[in-house]
Amino acid sequence: MTHAGPGQLYARRMRRIASAAALVLLAGGCGPRADAEEVAEAPAAEGPWACRIVTPEVTLGSPVREASGASLDRRAPGVFWTHGDSGNPPVLFALGRNGELLGRVPVEGARNRDWEDMAIGPCPGGTCVYVADIGNNNARQMDLVLYRAPVPSPGDPATAPAEEFRARFPGAGRDAEGVFVLPQGEIYLVTKGGSGPVELWRWPTPLAAGTVQQLERVRELAPRVRQLGDLVTGAGASPDGRWVALRTYGRLAIYRAADLLGTGEPAYTMDLAPLGESFGEAVAIESDGTLLLVSEGRGVTTGSRAAWLQCALPQA
């Protein structure tokens, strides 16, 4: 396929739509066909909402297999962290803007049953990395595990010993792949939508080790997803807490955090198909609109990759 070159406008305008329509577009397989068509024809957003591709395709360093989560390193622009999903070692990989491997840091005391996402956010000791071992394709009832450790440096031999926290969904189990942490320390999960509605859940804080906490439902984001490409696979919050990005295999939605958490105001959304990702799994966003997308890939022929976008986020 032909990718847009650096600096080319990726989407002339992000489409601003009514909240119900925004949810249909995030989970496009839901709802009547007429609704989906109406969303597709929604007028372009007013104002400076636009994203452009800066780097359309970056191959990640060879040790990275089946990348499943991503976070931007706040100390070094252009550096990001990722990890593999189930079957991979409990390791964080630090990579440069062009995918070059900067470090391989085991998470001490952790195991990788099915790591799905990661986030960087505040903790009692300063700034920590949160790794979510929450994969649950069968949506059975089970403990979800969150590991927390101070953010390492790329050259560290291992993280400090990770704290382990456990929680469960009340009632039936759910599959979730998106996690984000806000500046005040609130931790949120987004369910995938394959076995039930796409939902936003809060992990109770302060985190409590040695017990199993109960997750708190915040709101439904969309009905159950009917198409593979609309499953929610990643989430990320900007360091200033103003923006939350959610992604599916084929779409990106950027919310004002306050809107996502309860007001129901519109999201800004865009189609990711032009990037040609192979199983897009992760998203991370900076306060200035720098946005990272990571795809898992498949085997040696389509390894894990990343793309960099720059989005002009409204200041008001």
Q: Where are the regions that the model predicts?
A:
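Secretory targeting and sorting signals
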Residues: 14-37
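Short, positively charged and aromatic/hydrophobic N-terminal segments
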Residues: 9-10
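Sequence/structural signature of beta-propeller domains
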Residues: 30-316
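Position-driven detector of the extreme protein N-terminus
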Residues: 2-3, 15
